[in-house]
Regions:
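Anionic-ligand binding patches
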Residues: 10-12, 18-223
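N-terminal amphipathic/basic-hydrophobic helices that include classical n-h-c signal peptides
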Residues: 1-8, 222
Length: 223
């Protein structure tokens, strides 16, 4: 807000996934903020998520689309990390069973991988990246710990939701009402942190991040 007026601001969400867009819209509520998905802009590329971490993928998506659309852009990369599988499926969560992405095949593969495993601790991780129109990005992270079930439960949600019960609850993500899931999920936690961290930037129509004046010598000039 400037002088008490709400400045309209457009925020591009780097996704064509209607579930994800709806979840972000429900959480990211600020006066004057208009949220649009990638389909609302013509000619935006599909960004190849080839990073080795959620952080790398989130930043790549946010920066690529921000530069193309010349608009503040929010991207997330998220997935499931299973302790007994050394963090798999991790960044491969959407394509765990191969191409094209297939939720049923992914869930079936996960059940097979954990068939004889008693220790079923897991966590959903979400990294949210926000890029300025000029391509400078910052990130925040949200984590939801829980465990993997021995069978699918529930029909709500998407992805691995029917397989995952968050710590402190008896219902799987796919059995929960959206209102509850949108309070405790990894994406909810990351977006809540994003709101707290970036509220001032998103409340105005800034062209870039506020300047942080820290003089830094180039590495080759030191010593």
């Amino acid at each position: 807000a400037v002088n008490g007026l709400v400045v309209p601001m457009k925020l591009l969400i780097a996704t064509r996934n209607p579930h994800k867009l709806a979840e972000i819209r429900a959480l990211f509520v600020l006066p004057g903020l208009t949220i649009v998905g990638a389909d609302a802009f013509g000619g935006l590329p599909d960004v190849v998520e080839d990073g080795s971490s959620f952080q790398a993928n989130g930043v790549k998506k946010a920066v690529t689309l921000a530069l193309r659309a010349r608009c503040w852009t929010l991207a997330d990369d998220s997935g499931l990390e299973v302790e007994a599988l050394n963090g798999e499926p991790g960044v491969q969560s959407a394509r765990y069973a191969g191409e094209p992405p297939d939720t049923s095949a992914n869930n079936a593969k996960l059940l097979r991988a954990l068939e004889s495993v008693e220790q079923r601790a897991a966590r959903f991780v979400c990294v949210v990246a926000l890029s300025s129109p000029g391509g400078r990005a910052q990130i925040v992270e949200g984590v939801c710990p829980g465990r993997i079930l021995r069978e699918s439960r529930g029909t709500k949600g998407f992805g691995y939701d029917p397989m995952f019960v968050p710590d402190g609850y008896r219902l799987s993500f796919a059995e929960m009402d959206a209102a509850l899931k949108n309070t405790i999920s990894h994406r909810a936690r990351a977006l809540q942190r994003a709101l707290r961290t970036w509220r001032d930037v998103l409340a105005g129509d800034a062209a870039d991040w506020p300047a942080i004046r820290k003089p830094r010598l180039p590495a080759e000039a030191e010593g």
